[in-house]
Amino acid sequence: IIISGPSAGAHLTSLLVYDKEIQNRMNVDLKGVIGFIGVGGPYSFSTKTTTAVKLLLNQLFQKGYDRTLGEPCSRMAKSSVPMLLIQSKHDGLIDYSCAELMYKRALEIGNRCELYSVEDKNNTHSWYTAGMFLEKREENKTLDKFLCWIEQCC
């Protein structure tokens, strides 16, 4: 099993895979999980954020709430599950530094992690997080990376 999610799905699935407290509380068994792929996820709320993300965070978290309690980057524990983070420097919604922080944190605690920077011309948030699946892997470097990484895990 390889767990993956785009955007908010990357946020939630990364918590599922790398947050031991959530795993214990929800009785999550990761024995069959051999990889995680996050695509354009908001892994940290302390990085540069767009107005849209700020509005969403203000709706999700009460004023004064410690938002690090909801950050995959802050809650990540040591894990044997390797990680691929796919992020665009031209995302427009989620800043590239979000993925960079997650990548650095993973390496810092000894987790295997790779950060892939989207090179395709269609590199905005909606396009590469979902639209890449509308193309063939020969046409889309990001989709090819996604599929190659899965093939390497198997």
Predicted regions and their residues:
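Primarily recognizes the serine-hydrolase "nucleophile elbow" in alpha/beta-hydrolase
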Residues: I1-T51
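Active-site-proximal beta-strand/loop segments in catalytic clefts of secreted hydrolases
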Residues: P6-S7, V39-P42, Q87-K89, V118-K121
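Loop/turn elements at helix/coil->beta-strand transitions in domains of secreted/extracellular proteins
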Residues: G32-I34, S80-P82, N111
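Short beta-strand/loop motif that positions the catalytic acidic residue
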Residues: S79, L85-Q87, D91
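Conserved alpha/beta-hydrolase "acid-adjacent" motif
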Residues: G92-L101
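C-terminal catalytic histidine-bearing segment of alpha/beta-hydrolase fold enzymes
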Residues: E100-K104, E108-C154
